[in-house]
Amino acid sequence: AGELAVADTGAANDIYDKMIAQKANFPEGLKWTNDNYYGWKGGIYSGGFGCAAFAFAVSDAASGDARATIHHDYNNIRVGDILRVENDTHSVIVLEVKQDSVIVAEGNYNSSIHWGRELQKADLADNGSYIMTRY
């Protein structure tokens, strides 16, 4: 089991590095609204606008054309996962997983790109929320 954990950590670090590299394309404060569209390679949706467009673009940069799956296990959130939150109204992508919270990047947050907001895990799960993972 130890080898799997090490391999998983390596994959998470690689995904993190690829996501952070996207700051060059999507700098903090860049205007980003529902006018922005991105076609996604993850397979669940063909693409999205606004917050989903940003999450999908960063996800593709990190995971290529790996297929995504949906789950609702909030104890199994991983770096690079896309969280659909706030009763299915906002998408964020996970940069870091802590014991009780996650650090995310997001588009269309106050009409712009934002890196580094902390969300409490206890606030993530609601009736409309889910997790898209590409692991």
Feature-to-residue mapping (PLM):
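N-terminal capping segments
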Residues: A1-D60
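Alpha-helix initiation/capping motif
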Residues: G47-C51, D73, Q120-A125
